[in-house]
Amino acid sequence: MKVLVTGFEPFNGETINPSFEAIKMLPDEVEGAKIIKAKLPTVFRKSLCELEELISKENPDIVICVGQAAGRSKISIERVAINIDDAEINDNEGNKPKDEKIFVDGENAYFSNLPIKLMVKTIKEHNIPAEISNSAGTYVCNHVFYGLMYLIDKKFKNLKGGFIHVPFSHNQVLEKKNVPSMSLEDITNGLFYAIKGVLSEK
């Protein structure tokens, strides 16, 4: 069993991205499953090309993409990805798509096929705040989530996949006012228990 877990590079002036910093701290194996860790560029299109290459190369059974969500206070297990790019800020190569479909031949939306409620339950059992989210936004996170589910629908039909948003880490909010954050250790543990939840699904 292989689980591919991806995070993103920093963006929008941040020096770190807790999604990848937390992934780096995950063990190399969970419940006997090999954990493959990778960093995606915070760039429309390029992120999806790299994700597809990773899936083709590693042939994982499960893919969990992780991203940073400013303003979130909990580990957010995303339910649905929508077929739209509508950026409020530039990506890391200056792209700022507005009201553009991600794939013209894709569905309007795709749902995660991970056991999202079981993932939330498993995380919360270890006293880490978690929730189901019904919006992954319209930036690169939703772009990658939608692209993953599109690839599962069109190409990698036996693959399980989904997306998790994590809060800022504490050191990112030292100069920000009233912005929620979570320790990198808790973010890492939240991802660990999310993976355990997926692997425990009967």
Swiss-Prot record:
Give me any GO biological process, just one: proteolysis
Drop me one GO molecular function for this one: pyroglutamyl-peptidase activity
Keyword Hydrolase among record annotations: yes
Entry EC number(s): 3.4.19.3
The protein's UniProt keywords, in alphabetical order, are: Cytoplasm, Hydrolase, Protease, Thiol protease
Q: What does this protein do?
A: Removes 5-oxoproline from various penultimate amino acid residues except L-proline.
User: What's the protein here called?
Assistant: Pyrrolidone-carboxylate peptidase
Q: Which organism is it from?
A: Thermosipho melanesiensis (strain DSM 12029 / CIP 104789 / BI429)
